């Protein structure tokens, strides 16, 4: 509205601050401020806490039922992932990048193998 653009919010769930993943995403965020490329306009929110149950439910829905083990260790389905997570939230696999606006989830296995983070955005 009124010519204003809102930035997408990306949340990086990580165990500690200042990881390589966070540094790379920050570089892309800064680069995005200097370009007209709307794909690079985002706000990075870094969370060292595990996601809420509601957040995890959204993430699992976006990643798909067959890939729930990418977010929760040992999970065989969305329901199983939620149950395991309720009993032990440390089963959540980090780092994990979530683009809430686009419904994209990049689990740890993808983040740790990615050299070009712009492909995740």
From Swiss-Prot:
Putative mitochondrial redox protein which could be involved in the reduction of small toxic molecules. One of its GO terms (cellular component) is mitochondrion. The active site is at 96. It is found in: Mitochondrion. Residues 1-17 form a transit peptide. The gene is fmp46. Transmembrane segments: none annotated. SUPFAM superfamilies: Thioredoxin-like. It comes from Schizosaccharomyces pombe (strain 972 / ATCC 24843). Keywords: Mitochondrion, Oxidoreductase, Transit peptide. Its main location: mitochondrion. It holds the Pfam family DUF1687. This is Putative redox protein fmp46, mitochondrial. GO terms for molecular function: oxidoreductase activity. Belongs to the FMP46 family. Its EC number is 1.-.-.-.
């Amino acid at each position: 509205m009124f010519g204003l653009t809102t930035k997408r919010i990306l949340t990086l769930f990580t165990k500690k601050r200042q990881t390589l993943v966070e540094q790379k995403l920050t570089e892309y965020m800064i680069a995005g401020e200097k370009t007209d490329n709307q794909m690079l306009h985002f706000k990075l929110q870094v969370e060292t806490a595990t996601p809420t149950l509601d957040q995890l439910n959204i993430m699992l829905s976006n990643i798909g039922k067959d890939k729930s083990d990418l977010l929760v260790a040992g999970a065989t389905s969305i329901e199983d992932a939620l149950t395991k997570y309720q009993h032990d939230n440390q089963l959540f696999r980090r780092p994990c990048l979530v683009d809430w606006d686009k419904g994209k989830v990049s689990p740890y296995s993808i983040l740790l193998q990615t050299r070009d983070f712009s492909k995740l955005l």
